[in-house]
Amino acid sequence: MNDPMDENNLLNDRDMIKDGHGKKQRPNTSKAAALVILFGVCLYLAYSTLFTEKQQPVEVQKEGIIKQTELFRPAPPKPVSLEPTIEKNNVLLPKVELPTPPKKTTNSDDSLLEAAQRAPVLAYANTQKGQGSTEKNKDISANQPEAKPDETAQRFNHLLKPTTLEGIRAAKLGNRNYIIAMGASIPCILETAISSDQQGFASCIVSRDILSDNGRVVLLDKGTQIVGEYRAGLKKGQKRLFVLWNRAKTPNGIIITLASPATDALGRSGMDGDIDNHWLERIGSALLVSIVKDATNYVKGRLPKDQDKNNSETISSGQNIANIAVENYANIPPTLSKNQGEMVNVFVARDLDFSNVYKLKVIENKKQIVNRALSRNFYKNSAVICNEPKLAHIER
């Protein structure tokens, strides 16, 4: 009843069905494998994020605030040791105890003082950061333009300010009978000759009597010796030599410091004289160089070519020596010479006071009649005693 063909067909159909189911189930297995892989990746990421060691972050120093726990108290002053001191007479003095001032008690209810004492102190740990910030601030301030005031307003304010002039009070010169005032001129005859090649001293003799400022008393007698000094060396173009007169000595042995410069008859500073510019030495050195050069060139031309190389150093050395001689003679400074017996002047640069060495005595003319009934000090008011220009006689 059962046909074998039918069974074979059924078997083939089943195989066909299995093959069809198999083909349909392949996509499902691939999806499952993808899900498994995705799940594994998720597990790996979760494991790596949860169980791996965390990197320690870089610690950044923060500004710490240190709170003050105790009240601010200033440092107590050091006590002064009052030990017995030893005097010059080697006597020990007893120890002295000074009364100490009472301590001031502060009220604890002063809230402002207590708040100031308990105020927190800010401590900055990172100094480099602070320095960098200050430098940045300086750079920013340097880049910013400076705020200049209004120039017109500043000028106007300056114009409104008057010029302040300090007043100078007049003073008395003193007793003019004893004073040679500044600005006086003392004629003097040179006692020694002067040459500016070397520095040295000079002396001169006063040619006439030098009177006081009022012209009544002779303070520097004729024949007074004045000593001075001068420096060496004149610069090129100078024709006057500076001389400083230091001291004057009268024939009676009275000395006084002058510290005054020398002048000529017209009051020009310095001392003139004969100037020697040493033209002969300068021109002679130049001629020497030219002669040496011509001679070396002539000798060089007469030498054969073989000996020219050997003698070139000798010829060049001769030219160098001549050049050095020219340089030395070209820098010779001029020389000023002044002979003895010539007239010079001394310009008094300060007031000369002779009151501590001279004393005046009032003298009377025998032919003059004086009213003795006058109650007057004749020493101070000498015009009553003598009407002549000559007032007094110096007692030395």
From Swiss-Prot:
GO cellular component, one term: plasma membrane
The protein, known as: Type IV secretion system protein virB10
Keywords attached to this entry: Cell inner membrane, Cell membrane, Membrane, Transmembrane, Transmembrane helix, Transport, Virulence
UniProt function note: The type IV secretion system VirB/VirD4 is a major virulence determinant for subversion of human endothelial cell (HEC) function. VirB-dependent changes of HEC include massive cytoskeletal rearrangements, a pro-inflammatory activation by nuclear factor NF-kappa-B, inhibition of early and late events of apoptosis, leading to an increased cell survival, and, at high infection doses, a cytostatic or cytotoxic effect, which interferes with a potent VirB-independent mitogenic activity. These changes of HEC require the T4S coupling protein VirD4 and at least one of the effector proteins BepA-G.
Pfam families linked to this entry: TrbI (PF03743)
Induction (free text): During the interaction with the intracellular environment of host cells.
UniProt entry tagged with the keyword Nuclease: no
Family label: Belongs to the TrbI/VirB10 family.
Biased composition regions of type Polar residues, renumbered to the chain: 126-144
Domain of life assignment: Bacteria
Gene3D superfamilies: Type IV secretion system, VirB10/TraB/TrbI (2.40.128.260)
Localization per Swiss-Prot or TrEMBL: Cell inner membrane
Membrane topology listed for this record: Single-pass membrane protein
Composition bias, Basic and acidic residues: 12-22
Region (Disordered): 1-29, 126-150
Residues passing through the membrane, by range: 32-52
UniProt-listed NCBIfam families: T4SS_VirB10
Subunit structure: Interacts with virB4, virB8 and virB9.
Gene: virB10
